[in-house]
């Protein structure tokens, strides 16, 4: 698909150490991408998102668009906004998350979503946004080494039956 290849291709060209890119449309992330509220690590597993999650906005560079990364120029622009970071929000669209392996990229994606939900809840509870306590850079560095071997096995166990059930509902294409 052109859209995914532009996103993934731009990042793979810019980041040779990346072997997995996850693009998603998490509704928990959209508010952070459209308000400019920084998405910051708020709990121990949130450290996997790193110290900064930039927001890529296509409008300044490309004018009014449909918010989709439809060509390689936009893919390169998104990759530049991501830089050396682990994730980037896409204004009004979703996010991209990267990793050296699929389990790492998927783990970061899941915990990015969890972190966004927790941060939004904390901001709602706080009388003043400055009352919310985030992880500092040292805590992020101390925690971000976490691997996903155990989580990956659990996610596979949980998702394989669901994916198999969905596959069973799809019609089998006729033989040529």
What is each residue range found by the language model?
Residues 1-176:
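Glycine-rich flexible loops
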């Amino acid at each position: 698909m052109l859209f995914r290849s532009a996103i993934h291709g731009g990042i793979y060209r810019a980041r040779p150490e990346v072997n997995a890119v996850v693009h998603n449309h998490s509704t928990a992330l959209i508010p952070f991408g459209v308000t400019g509220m920084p998405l910051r690590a708020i709990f121990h597993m949130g450290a996997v998102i790193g110290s900064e999650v930039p927001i890529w906005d296509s409008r300044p560079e490309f004018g009014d668009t449909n918010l989709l990364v439809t060509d390689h120029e936009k893919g390169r622009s998104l990759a530049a906004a991501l830089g050396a970071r682990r994730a980037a929000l896409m204004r009004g669209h979703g996010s991209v998350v990267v990793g050296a392996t699929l389990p790492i990229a998927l783990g970061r994606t899941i915990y990015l979503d969890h972190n966004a939900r927790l941060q939004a809840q904390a901001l709602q509870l706080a009388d003043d946004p400055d009352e919310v306590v985030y992880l500092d850079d040292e805590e992020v560095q101390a925690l971000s080494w976490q691997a996903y071997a155990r989580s990956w096995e659990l996610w596979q166990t949980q998702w394989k039956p669901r994916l198999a059930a969905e596959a069973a509902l799809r019609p089998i294409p006729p033989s040529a």
